[in-house]
Amino acid sequence: MISEEKINLNYTRWIERLKHYDCYSERLIDEIGDKIKNASFSLQESSGAAYQGSMIDVVLNNLCVIACHLNSLAFGVNKDKVLHPYLQVNQNSLIRELLLQHIAKAEMFILQTNQWKAKQGYLFDFNPNMNTCLKCGERTTFLCMKYGIELTEEEFEAIRIIDKEDSVANQYITPLCQLVKMANQLVSIELYRKHKEQNKENNY
């Protein structure tokens, strides 16, 4: 859980970054901004990311941070020399993609109303009133199109990477896609382990 003040602060920071990275849409904010502000990143409590406002909280404070560290430290510049020029991705494109990737959850996830499911740790549930069965990445790209946010071909592909099952390594996948996928996986591991450790401490 985070405070209402933190939720509002995160939302303000998120909007500022949208504007800075040229992926801001006034209509998006006007029509579903409140839903985005309060959206959960995950459905299940054990994930460590199922709470009001967690979508933006996780994106800003975990996802963007880890992805940018990977891009700059693992693939970036060392002593004025690019370490891995064929792997490093454009930082602006990376952050644009990460800021937007999970906005579909604002429409897809709703607060849990079933007490039995809530007791099992499912604090949020899928919205039964969705008109289609688009996955998160697909719905996010639809929302970007709907609200006039332009994406490059690589950004479009990278947003949808979270919808895809792990498969045999593909040498044609873009570094942006692979980095985004890796960052999402690492964030899931980090938040799960943090939540597990906090639960252990609380039980002592």
Where are these regions (language model features)?
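Metal-dependent phosphohydrolase cores
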Residues: 1-204
